[in-house]
């Protein structure tokens, strides 16, 4: 019951070198204030929108239909295709439009239409249906990568699909309401986060406010070296996984025992995993291996390589960041299957990109994690693809001159290391200058959060409300309060533990698409790539208590004030850590 003990203990460790200064006691946050905009009614019937010619706006032949959708929040639904094959959808309120437009990104390799304004707590324009919504499938159907042979579809996925959908949506807004939107927003996570940054970099005038969550900004590296390394390390000589789900229980408990208290509080989550110096040898089996109790010498070696990240034989770091200490319970969603007969999702993530999207022409002999070269030369060979897909250009001065950017990431993200976001934030400061960056950009890091949501830590927060309030009232968010409802110890909501061999997931890994391998409802009826333990292999059925925690704008962190419940945000104050070197040293650092 170590996990339960760790979660209920709360202690102060005195003055830690981690913190340079402490802010005064936290006070109630000011209410978020958005602009008061007069509701606007349509100036034409919904059906008449279908008579418009959008080719002039999108720059390509565009076909679409327009249909009224009844309900508590009725809207005009426009569904269409922008040549070559960008399917898009726009929802325009039939009454009470408050002059705002929100476009949402897609996850994985996209391939389906799903408007998902997530993290909308407290965002009235979204919750009351008074905002125009739009999204695109990024130019192809299905979450596979078979379309990768087509150069136009590669470009659509890389950046064009989002942009032309934006152009179409804005043209529809102007025609339907007789005026343009007052504010335009974009929000996405995972690949949607990459899409968000791509908009800021390539089309800085498209949006006034952008929220980029866990962005797959180093797309080619992420889906070649990162996932390839994870798959290779966790595949034994017999072709079976070295680590399986039961091994995560003692590993994660040992990490928490070693590093949970570094911030002065033992609360079941690690505030800054960069400070954790953990050696998995502390749980090396002293006798025979027993699943769920200890690790073999081989498993210890694999865990060390997983924490270290992809390297060449010369020792060159081939990626910005690897798995962070404290993320172990999230590894099931990519490269640690439930049993030794399970598949390693990271293998599929890697092969989908390397064999279908990275090279022209595609490799004659497909790569696997066992045959893909982890070399400097292979990184160089992927440069053309990096320039196409990756949203790693830190020169976003044109966007920052008028817009606002919220960058956010979970510290326990197993698919995209939060070190990518930290590095990008630092490089924007070098390019634009810290004054311009700090006036228009914020980074928020969430302890214990997995990929886009979930995990041990609080992961639901008013993202869109904060973004809109910043853009419309000019008040930058200094903190956001994140919440965690009651959930099981592996980060799943209460009531769905044991739902099947493929546990429910949110956000989806970078190459799994909305439904993971197997489509919108994968083999387990949910996201197949986000594997959870099957019945009979669960950790003890403990329930983590509801928790709220302030998340302060980077580099500040939350520190327990010494009074009140550790599950109450009011018990925490802002602390400024000692400075860290945030620009990563790796093979791509010179770009």
Regions found by a protein language model. Name each.
Residues 179-190:
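Alpha/beta-hydrolase fold nucleophile elbow
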Residues 189-198:
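Glycine-rich nucleophile elbow surrounding the catalytic serine of serine-hydrolase chemistry
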Residues 198-200, 205-311, 445, 459, ...:
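A catalytic-pocket lid/entrance helix-loop region that shapes and gates access to the active site
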Residues 407-409:
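Short beta-strand/loop motif that positions the catalytic acidic residue
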């Amino acid at each position: 019951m170590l996990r339960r003990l760790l979660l209920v203990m709360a202690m102060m460790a005195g003055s830690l070198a981690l913190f340079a200064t402490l802010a005064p006691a936290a006070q109630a946050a000011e209410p978020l204030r958005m602009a008061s905009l007069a509701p606007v009614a349509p100036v034409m019937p919904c059906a008449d929108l279908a008579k418009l010619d959008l080719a002039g706006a999108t720059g390509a032949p565009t076909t679409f239909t327009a249909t009224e959708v009844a309900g508590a929040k009725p809207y005009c639904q426009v569904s269409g295709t922008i040549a070559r094959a960008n399917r898009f959808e726009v929802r325009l309120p039939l009454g009470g439009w408050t002059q705002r437009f929100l476009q949402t990104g897609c996850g994985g390799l996209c391939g389906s239409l799903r408007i998902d304004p997530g993290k909308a707590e407290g965002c009235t324009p979204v919750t009351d249906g008074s905002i125009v919504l739009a999204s695109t499938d990024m130019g192809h159907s299905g979450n596979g990568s078979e379309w990768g042979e087509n150069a136009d579809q590669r470009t659509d996925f890389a950046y064009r699909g989002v942009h032309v959908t934006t152009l179409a949506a804005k043209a529809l807004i102007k025609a339907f309401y007789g005026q343009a939107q007052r504010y335009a927003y974009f929000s996405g996570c995972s690949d949607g986060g990459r899409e968000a940054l791509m908009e800021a970099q390539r089309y800085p005038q498209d949006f006034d406010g952008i929220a980029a969550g866990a962005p797959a900004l180093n797309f080619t590296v992420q889906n070649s070296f990162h996932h390839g390394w994870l798959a290779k390390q966790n595949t034994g000589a017999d072709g079976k996984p070295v680590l399986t789900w039961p091994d995560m229980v003692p590993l994660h408990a040992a990490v928490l025992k070693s590093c949970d208290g570094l911030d002065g509080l033992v609360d079941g989550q690690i505030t800054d995993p960069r400070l954790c110096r953990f050696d998995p040898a502390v749980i090396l089996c002293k006798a025979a291996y027993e699943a769920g109790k200890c690790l073999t010498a081989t498993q210890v070696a694999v865990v060390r390589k997983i924490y270290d990240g992809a390297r060449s034989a010369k020792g060159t770091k081939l990626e910005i960041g690897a798995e962070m200490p404290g993320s172990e319970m999230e590894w099931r969603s990519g490269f640690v299957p439930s049993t030794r007969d399970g598949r390693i999702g990271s293998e599929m993530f890697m092969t989908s990109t390397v064999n279908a999207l990275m090279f022209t022409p595609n490799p004659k002999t497909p790569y696997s994690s066992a045959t893909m070269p982890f070399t400097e030369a292979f990184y160089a060979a992927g440069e053309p693809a990096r320039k196409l897909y990756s949203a790693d250009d830190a020169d976003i001065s044109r966007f920052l001159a008028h817009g606002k950017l919220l960058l956010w990431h979970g510290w326990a993200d197993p698919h995209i290391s939060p070190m990518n976001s930290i590095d990008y934030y630092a490089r924007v400061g070098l390019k634009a200058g810290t004054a311009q960056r700090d006036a228009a950009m914020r980074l928020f890091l969430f302890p214990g959060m997995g990929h886009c949501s979930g995990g041990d830590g609080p992961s639901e927060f008013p993202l869109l409300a904060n973004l809109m309030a910043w853009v419309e009232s000019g008040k930058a968010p200094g903190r956001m309060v994140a919440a965690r409802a009651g959930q099981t110890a592996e980060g799943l909501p209460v009531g769905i533990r044991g739902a099947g061999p493929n546990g429910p997931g949110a956000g989806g890994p970078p190459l799994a698409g909305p439904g993971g391998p197997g489509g919108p409802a994968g083999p387990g009826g949910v996201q197949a790539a986000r594997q959870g333990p099957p019945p009979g292999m669960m950790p003890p059925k403990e329930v983590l208590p509801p928790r709220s925690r302030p998340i302060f704008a980077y580099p500040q962190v939350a520190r327990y004030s010494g009074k009140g419940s550790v599950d109450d945000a009011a018990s925490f104050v802002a602390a400024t850590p000692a400075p860290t070197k945030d620009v990563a040293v790796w093979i791509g650092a010179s770009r």
